[in-house]
Amino acid sequence: MKSRPAETAAVSKPKVSVRHLCKTYQGRNRSEITVFNEINLDVNPEEFVCIVGPSGCGKTTFIKIIDGLVPATSGSVYVNGSEVTEPDFDRAFVFQADSLYPWRTILDNVAFGLEIKGVDRKERYPRARELIKRVGLSRFESHYPHELSGGMRQRVNLARALAVDPEIILMDEPFASLDAQTREVMQQELLNVWSSSRKTVLFITHQIDEAIYLADRVIVFSARPSTIKAEIRVEIPRPRRLSVKRSPKFLEYVGAIWNLIESDIFESVSISE
């Protein structure tokens, strides 16, 4: 197991580069509140990176800045060497909350991004069907979101993100609302899709075991004002199966990351002894 200092080593051509990123906002009494400060991170092409940290440390804000949904106070984000100033089709965002359109069928939901992109109907629907098949929902393409389970809806969200063929997928706790068994099934489904698509993924989670199971690297945020406390390179061979979560090496990673964030978690929820 390798834990490295907060600032990552430079790579030749990172897919995502974050440099000196800072986010502040004005509190109720007009005081300046710093969410995070001096965040530096490189993410390589096809890499799966998970971010963990205590509640309120700015994980969601961080990936929204990478997507261009939220402006940084200072610092910069680069995708393929170009500075991010707004959302673009090279990035897709999968939200924690269900973001499917209830009046659209599953097929129409998956095809929506292609429609916005201006792809012709004759091209976008075969593409949407291909992705629906990839996530195992071919029998449900004419159904509406309310007719699907939570896990099935998140598969549709993933298919919709993949439909526009982004280079980067940003995922904000997409399995948080699912029960434990469904969450584990979705973790395996996500790895299966990622192994075939080889997209670059940044994935936010509060679940340490989920981060270790999915990631090539786990980035650990400190409590607010956040910095990158450490990065853990997960040296567990792929392909991974759920049974690996019971292995001594996996549990060693869980313990190491928990030791890094335990005090910050108690601080973030204001629990004192």
Model-inferred region functions:
Residues R104-A111:
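Short coil-to-helix segment of the ABC ATPase nucleotide-binding domain corresponding to the Q-loop/switch region
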Residues I169-D172:
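Catalytic Walker B motif of ABC-type/P-loop ATPase nucleotide-binding domains
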Residues A111, E115, K122-R139, N192:
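Conserved ABC ATPase "signature" region
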Residues D67:
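Helix-to-loop junction immediately C-terminal to a conserved catalytic motif
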Residues H143-H146, V164:
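Conserved signature/switch motifs of ABC ATPase nucleotide-binding domains
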Residues G75-P87:
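Conserved ABC transporter NBD signature motif
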Residues V52-P54:
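The feature captures the beta-strand-to-loop junction immediately N-terminal to the Walker
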